[in-house]
Amino acid sequence: QKAARRLPGRLTVCGHSKGGNFAVYAAAFCGEEIQDRIEAVYNYDGPGFDSKVLSEPGYQRICQKIQTFVPQSSVVGMLLGHEEKYIIVHSEQTFLQQHDTYSWEVLQKHFHYLDTVDNSSRFVDYTLKAWLAQMTPAQREQFVDAIYEVMRQTNAHTLHQMNENWLA
């Protein structure tokens, strides 16, 4: 809201990973006057929200402006719920390494788009959503924060590397 008050004209809000989640949240809860100035919200492989946030009037007002980009084996971007459609991007890396946007393939002026996520992403999506649905909001927040911290601390790019580096 502070930035929007200081910037004239149309706004674009964006972020990657947890920043993508924050961008969507900020756009959803900034108030109608600022929402009317927002042209687009770009979420690059950021997690979604629980059903309470998805049903909020502010989220519903901004939902049509949200564009969420995920790589074909997305894990982070598939966490929690999204009402907007995913735009699937081809990554030149595997599994968790695909979260790095520098691995996303660009063809001239746009990403290399794919029609669907792969089977591993669908499996992780189904499994994690079923598991997270049983948690309290506080537990979900702790879980997502813990995943980010483990990935950061271990410099892991795959589950195998995460396991190898767990006690290092």
Feature-to-residue mapping (PLM):
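Alpha/beta hydrolase fold serine-hydrolase catalytic domain that processes acyl esters and thioesters
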Residues: 1-11, 31-168
